[in-house]
Amino acid sequence: MEEMEDTETEPQVYMACIQHGRRVGVSYYDCSVRQLHVLEFWEEDCSDFTLINMVKYQAKPSIIYASTKSEESFVAALQQNDGTDETTMVKLVKSSTFSYEQAWHRLVYLRVTGMDDGLNIKERICYLSSMMDVGSEVQVRVSGGLLAILESERIVETLEQNESGSASIAIDSVMEVPLNKFLKLDAAAHEALQIFQTDKHPSHMGIGRAKEGFSVFGMMNKCATPMGRRLLRSWFMRPILDLEVLDRRLNAISFFISSVELMASLRETLKSVKDISHLLKKFNSPTSLCTSNDWTAFLKSISALLHVNKIFEVGVSESLREHMRRFNLDIIEKAGLCISTELDYVYELVIGVIDVTRSKERGYQTLVKEGFCAELDELRQIYEELPEFLQEVSAMELEHFPHLHKEKLPPCIVYIQQIGYLMCIFGEKLDETALNRLTEFEFAFSDMDGETQRFFYHTSKTRELDNLLGDIYHKILDMERAIIRDLLSHTLLFSAHLLKAVNFVAELDCILSLACVAHQNNYVRPVLTVESLLDIRNGRHVLQEMAVDTFIPNDTEINDNGRIHIITGPNYSGKSIYVKQVALIVFLSHIGSFVPADAATVGLTDRIFCAMGSKFMTAEQSTFMIDLHQVGMMLRQATSRSLCLLDEFGKGTLTEDGIGLLGGTISHFATCAEPPRVVVCTHLTELLNESCLPVSEKIKFYTMSVLRPDTESANMEEIVFLYRLIPGQTLLSYGLHCALLAGVPEEVVKRAAIVLDAFESNNNVDKLSLDKISSQDQAFKDAVDKFAELDISKGDIHAFFQDIFTS
């Protein structure tokens, strides 16, 4: 049985943005799921519009629409590249597009899947208010304006004329996105923590799609369905702060980890669920033609959805049900509500009309099941028996025209779609004499079949067949298409039920994916709290532990008795990995995932800031400037619930400037009444001087432990990095040892040790005493001695130079 190709197309996202003072309204439409998103927020600093950049990064629009009356700084922020390879086109439209009256009119007549057709205007407004804030002028203007643009650009489908005389726009859902309910991370944080990583297709011609590389999302994504992968990506893009939702996800993961067989059975079933949202969009489009592959995928998907419900109904033992009740899970009830009996009806409806194997068996395009329509069956039987019938008619015709008979290829009557029935004569065209005898023959056209030329004629018999049978193939197609259109219209009546089931399965797929990863990698359930603290026991880095044979875990404890952690230590000692693992454990906790640790208590975090030296390939700023920008946002926007990470901040400029900038940043946080949680990694050991940093109980110092049996030993190979975080400070970087580990030649490292020792003892650096250099010096001395002995007035200058340069 053929299946629809399971490919995920890049989503087309169209966005509109308007500014009203400091209040910004954003709406964007995702064509892949026919979903309209709307949000508004307050920009504290209208000079850089940081929240707009964050929304752009998350939505990844292909086009942004704005009013022609927008401020230049606002348009510049929309045009700004967020550092990724994708470039966004900003298109200015007339300001009246976003007028409140026109926008309100568009929203009132918006058709959302599941909305009753008989609702009046007041009831429509009530229905919409459950999905967005219709009382917000900014939200109404931006979403209504975007709908007008989508209609004018023919991006969305429009339905019949409504009572006002204009067409209604049809979409699947409207969703308000409140930013204050999410953990915020910008593109720099995603890059630094390697949450997403896109590997471009290696083709130089640009053929082929990019794929997810070695990233946190790539490792956690074990989803079996396209809808699950999309939803999980949105979870990673927008981690949440809702404790109730997070606990519900964690409870579900705990349950599935305790019932591995059930998890495996569900995941195997979900592999048969294709992209139903995409199929419904195709069914709803008047220009799309549904193939047998589409119907195969649709039927297999519904069958799999029904099987998921059956697994929950009969495949869950009483002990597992008791386990569910202990976790306060309502998965069985939710499955029964979402995967309703209407899906059974849709399956029986489609299977009663469509035969997905018929096209392959019959050799032509036909989908309607045999026995469904007697008239159609009769036409198809005639069409399938047409070659034998025409062969008989041809033989009878040749009896009337014996002089047309040829030995190799006798004339025959053929059927050509959209043209009709014709007499085909091979090799030579009938001459005038023959046509005078055959008065009923009328030349139509000629063509080549390989090396044989064919000539086609209308005859009285072919005209009779035209009148009797007509263009039978297209009669069949027209009749089948009418039947399938009727089937589609009935199927689409259940779109809301199908989408409800799809949304349930997508969420289930995400939970199963996270549970699978947690079970495979021995993750634990984090404890989430409203208190602003962080307590991790034996935390690990999500990706690093996959890449090494042995990973050394570390503890983290950030509370009111030390919210600023300054970590010093050698290169290669694991400081950066530690900082990132802390952030990733916090990040995964806000997705509702288990985390790589023995235990973790995580306070809700509103934002993760990263100044970690990450640089986008397309960024127009230096790494140091990017870090300065990140630190500037930390100082302005960080709250007591934020997590700020600084890795080697200050190294991109003069040492004195770097010390001053880092010291000033830490001092600012230390003097805050309620500072954020701050983790700093640095080699600027001058900061350890009391003149650089204030004495504060909020600051704690840590270092990465190093084992060196004899501190006086000159053998650098005896140093062992333990990758263990311990309280304390260190002034040593062990840079020479790191150079050896990195493969720097040993003679270079030894010379570096001599230079370093001379520098520390304030002595002159001894000149290199290599054999090659010594022989060169001796040759130069000999040349000088010979020149001193030469009597220029009497000597042979030519012989002198020849002697020097040959020697």
UniProtKB/Swiss-Prot annotation:
Known function: Involved in meiotic recombination in association with MSH4. Required for reciprocal recombination and proper segregation of homologous chromosomes at meiosis. Promotes homologous recombination through facilitating chiasma formation during prophase I. Involved in the control of class I crossovers formation.
Keywords assigned by UniProt, alphabetized: ATP-binding, Chromosome, DNA-binding, Meiosis, Nucleotide-binding, Nucleus
SMART domains attached to this UniProt entry: MUTSac (SM00534), MUTSd (SM00533)
Expressing tissues: Specifically expressed in flowers.
Name assigned to this protein: DNA mismatch repair protein MSH5
Binding site for ATP: G569, P570, N571, Y572, S573, G574, K575, S576
GO CC terms of this entry: condensed nuclear chromosome; cytosol; germ cell nucleus
Knocked-out gene: effects: Normal vegetative growth but severe reduction in fertility due to a decrease in chiasma frequency at metaphase I of meiosis.
Compartments, record wording: Nucleus; Chromosome
Family listed: Belongs to the DNA mismatch repair MutS family.
A single GO molecular function term of this UniProt record: ATP-dependent DNA damage sensor activity
Taxonomic superkingdom: Eukaryota
Keyword Zinc: no
Main location class: nucleus
Pfam families (alphabetical): MutS_III (PF05192), MutS_V (PF00488)
Keyword Nucleus among UniProt keywords: yes
GO biological process: chiasma assembly; homologous chromosome segregation; meiotic mismatch repair involved in reciprocal meiotic recombination; reciprocal meiotic recombination
